[in-house]
Amino acid sequence: MSNIEHGLSFIDIMVFAIYVAIIIGVGLWVSRDKKGTQKSTEDYFLAGKSLPWWAVGASLIAANISAEQFIGMSGSGYSIGLAIASYEWMSAITLIIVGKYFLPIFIEKGIYTIPEFVEKRFNKKLKTILAVFWISLYIFVNLTSVLYLGGLALETILGIPLMYSILGLALFALVYSIYGGLSAVVWTDVIQVFFLVLGGFMTTYMAVSFIGGTDGWFAGVSKMVDAAPGHFEMILDQSNPQYMNLPGIAVLIGGLWVANLYYWGFNQYIIQRTLAAKSVSEAQKGIVFAAFLKLIVPFLVVLPGIAAYVITSDPQLMASLGDIAATNLPSAANADKAYPWLTQFLPVGVKGVVFAALAAAIVSSLASMLNSTATIFTMDIYKEYISPDSGDHKLVNVGRTAAVVALIIACLIAPMLGGIGQAFQYIQEYTGLVSPGILAVFLLGLFWKKTTSKGAIIGVVASIPFALFLKFMPLSMPFMDQMLYTLLFTMVVIAFTSLSTSINDDDPKGISVTSSMFVTDRSFNIAAYGIMIVLAVLYTLFW
């Protein structure tokens, strides 16, 4: 790191242009129709169910890591520290659970969408309720937040006005994904992950090395721990000002499980990749690969935020960066500027790679969300209620149109998110108002045969006012605890309502679960145990 002029050099622009050309080229190549055929709905929405494990795993991470992580989680690293990494490290365990216990049931049912599974297990009414919810969530929360945070990064790094940045990112994602569907998204995701890891590693290495000075990278880590010991605590106590965001041990045994199980197990734009795998075994291998990658993500996105905190707190380090150090300076109120601020000081060429990584994080997530929004609207709304007799060609075109409309709406709303502070925490908190109720429906629907459609509908509808009550009641409570209590409340409501209908009989649509469904091969088991051992070591080191 050094005193670098604001913006990108010609070399950086060329590096980024090469990245853009590769992504668009691969996307268009994969998108082409086979000679004499047109894309079917399975081709467009599930990549023809042909994905190998490594493509599934890479695409899961590319869909997951977005501006929400690079910008939002780095901002939380600046404000909170390594404790925010629990979202990533606990996700690794969650992925293993999803791969072993949830995925076999979904693939056995041969579904396109999560709402479709809801109809098979419950009824059309609940499916429609959840389909509308997910479409709204993807457009008004996920797409808008990724566009806003990505636009914020471009504005900080290049000085491009926020609205133009948002429109540029939207157009980029649309160009390579709209025609080819999930195939284009997944195969470009494989390339995106390479840039994500490389760019994230470069930023982390150079930021920490700058702190270490002539003593090197490891000395930089040691200096960071000495300068900000509170930023290297995984479990926060009640005296910590960030306890309400990450409430101590409850992170490991409470509400974070709600957020992770919902996100990785029942989130359309995540689970869609596993549904597109060649087989259950390939999907499970892909999930383990993604779990391994989750172990390293905090070192790519959280550590730079902590480094930015240490640098901005040290007058000598700030002075050595020159006058540009005061440009777009992060603070407690503007923590999300931490990562873009760091990129100002990267050497020529490296900045281009990091900028490509940031763009990869943003556009891969945008493309994933667009494809999933289109899939749910087309298969669960349009085909169900508007045109049941539509053929594959018509449905694929409807999906493309739905993606464009969703993106236009998100672009109009995204600039309104300005001034939300720690965007990552904001997104988790407001998604957490609805995720516990949905998780309760799926957990009981999958594993308790007495769960009825009436119980599920009443439970999920009742969960939202209960969650709002916990959020706005006079006695403050960490939002992770709110999620856990909302989950338990919803499960009680569902169970009570279901039993009041029929206390003895199973629901006719109940799923018969046998132990043979959850048998995994030796490689999956070895990898799963290895990941859990690594997690135990990490939490022991940073407890």
From Swiss-Prot:
It comes from Vibrio parahaemolyticus. The chain crosses the membrane at residues 10-30, 45-65, 79-99, 129-149, 156-176, 193-213, 246-266, 287-307, 345-365, 401-421, 427-447, 455-475, 483-503, 523-543. GO terms for cellular component: plasma membrane. The lineage of its organism: Bacteria, Pseudomonadati, Pseudomonadota, Gammaproteobacteria, Vibrionales. One of its GO terms (molecular function) is D-glucose:sodium symporter activity. It is found in: Cell membrane. Belongs to the sodium:solute symporter (SSF) (TC 2.A.21) family. This is Sodium/glucose cotransporter. It is a multi-pass membrane protein. Actively transports glucose into cells by Na(+) cotransport. Keywords: Cell membrane, Ion transport, Membrane, Sodium, Sodium transport, Sugar transport, Symport, Transmembrane, Transmembrane helix, Transport.
